[in-house]
Amino acid sequence: MAKRDYYEVLGVSKTASEKEIKKAYKRLAMKYHPDRNQGDKEAESQFKEVKEAYEILTDDQKRAAYDQYGHAAFEQGGMGGGGADFSDIFGDVFGDIFGGGRRQQRPSRGADLRYSMELTLEEAVRGVTKEIRIPTLETCDICHGSGAKAGTSPVTCSTCQGAGQVHMRQGFFTVQQPCPHCHGRGQIIKDSCHKCHGHGRVERYKTLSVKIPAGVDTGDRVRLSGEGEAGAKGAPAGDLYVQVQVKSHHIFERQESNLYCEVPVNFAMAALGGEIEVPTLDGRVKLKIPAETQTGKMFRMKGKGVKSVRGGVQGDLLCRVVVETPVKLNERQKELLRELGESFGGAGEETNSPRSKSFFDGVKKFFDDLTK
């Protein structure tokens, strides 16, 4: 069966840039990788075809020869039996894209971990230290990360002599490729560790003490360097990122460095003025309510908000007044309110109800305009 054109295989034009070729390869390799298509021989064949096309078209010399001679340029010795390494999609697919596929593979850094931590508003504002328990991969304490049975060590690969690469004949060229025997590592484990089964790492839970700085807010994250998964074969560990989520508060609402709350005031105090206690994160403080205060009036208490973890000045506490209508009145109270209401006169009395006068004046004008 005739081979398909390499450009056609990757779905790119013959003038495609290396960046375009790499992008196409990444997409197709992810699509056809055997780990995603287990038992699908056709997908495996397409994966090999995509890999072969990528290796030719990202090598300047090979691409020039292919553009001039086509597949005939590589018929002597074929692809040298290099085949496709399906062991790790990230090592295989992304290794070539970022240059790792053409040199000896290095042990990979451990993966980063993420943990979502829920805090109360008080904890977020003041800072807190909490213990967390997370699943992770740690270096095996039996083989110390080598993957080899206790008392033994990995041996040098006899195929590549420890280089991790072999020279393969491909048409007019001799090129280096990752060793198919040791997968580019340069070493072979003959007797695997009984605990980690040759992986060098084991799954376990670990407990950490995490210090959350004062002033954090939802969306902030704290990085713990080196507390992620252990790296393979002695490589550095990844990091742990603790993502902060602040729970809603029954009194305060936070907006950046400011806090907001609603303060209920009875109608008598709102009319005559007075003093009430309002809560802050540091305790209760007195707030003076001037006479004739209306619902929605905002009072600012300087420095009673939050100091952001990023620095800057302390925020403020903004208290919004809500004038309450009295309920469950006894007969005496109702009588007094009737007398008070009668003393106000009609809705048009500007002196007692300026907003009501403005409203009813507007209503009267609206209907007057309709009847003109």
From Swiss-Prot:
GO terms for cellular component: cytoplasm. GO terms for biological process: chaperone cofactor-dependent protein refolding; DNA replication; protein refolding; response to heat. It comes from the Bacteria. The keyword rRNA-binding does not apply. Binds 2 Zn(2+) ions per monomer. Zn(2+) 2 binds at residues 157, 160, 179, 182. CXXCXGXG motif repeats lie at residues 140-147, 157-164, 179-186, 193-200. Residues 5-70 form the J domain. The keyword Metal-binding applies. InterPro entries: DnaJ (IPR012724), DnaJ_C (IPR002939), DnaJ_domain (IPR001623), DnaJ_domain_CS (IPR018253), HSP40/DnaJ_pept-bd (IPR008971), HSP_DnaJ_Cys-rich_dom (IPR001305), HSP_DnaJ_Cys-rich_dom_sf (IPR036410), J_dom_sf (IPR036869). Its cofactor is Zn(2+). A zinc finger (CR-type) spans 127-205. GO terms for molecular function: ATP binding; heat shock protein binding; unfolded protein binding; zinc ion binding. Pfam families: DnaJ, DnaJ_C, DnaJ_CXXCXGXG. It is found in: Cytoplasm. Zn(2+) 1 binds at residues 140, 143, 193, 196. Its main location: cytoplasm. Coiled coil: none annotated. Belongs to the DnaJ family. The J domain is necessary and sufficient to stimulate DnaK ATPase activity. Zinc center 1 plays an important role in the autonomous, DnaK-independent chaperone activity of DnaJ. Zinc center 2 is essential for interaction with DnaK and for DnaJ activity. NCBIfam families: DnaJ_bact, PRK10767.1. Participates actively in the response to hyperosmotic and heat shock by preventing the aggregation of stress-denatured proteins and by disaggregating proteins, also in an autonomous, DnaK-independent fashion. Unfolded proteins bind initially to DnaJ; upon interaction with the DnaJ-bound protein, DnaK hydrolyzes its bound ATP, resulting in the formation of a stable complex. GrpE releases ADP from DnaK; ATP binding to DnaK triggers the release of the substrate protein, thus completing the reaction cycle. Homodimer. This is Chaperone protein DnaJ. It comes from Photorhabdus laumondii subsp. laumondii (strain DSM 15139 / CIP 105565 / TT01) (Photorhabdus luminescens subsp. laumondii).
